[in-house]
Amino acid sequence: MISTDQKRKLISSFVTGDDLSTSDPYDVWKTRFGCWSKKLYAKNRFIALPLVAAITIIDVYFNNTLRLAYKKQEYPIVRALSAQVLINLYQLDGDEQHLNTAKQHLDWLLSESCLGYSGPCWGLGFKWVVSDTLTYDENTPLTTATPYILEAFIRY
């Protein structure tokens, strides 16, 4: 049985790195081909269904482990959740290093916020096709990310 201290060290090892790049379950849909396929599907589901079904099956069952043709990426939500984990660890053991590393994540978030808005905000960090007429670019803030980041700043 793994001890509580060992669990904390294991968790800490995941959230203390300088580079938190990771794969995303939706990697296939942020590729140029994936975006094109989603737009086609949004325009005509009957024509595009075999294509997007094939893409999904290949990605889930054959490429899920290998992640071929996908590049790992830093995501604001990963940094925010890592900062919150470190704040939790600090509250448990009082180790200042957890708080220092949480601050590094928060500094990264400030430097990587979406540009051109009235205040800091964050999005996915990649193009996301919503419909055949609406595509969010890499710099579009979304409510799916910003609240977690705001919570990390408030808790710090």
Task: Give the residues covered by each predicted segment.
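Glycan-recognition and catalytic cores of secretory/periplasmic carbohydrate-active enzymes
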Residues: 1-156
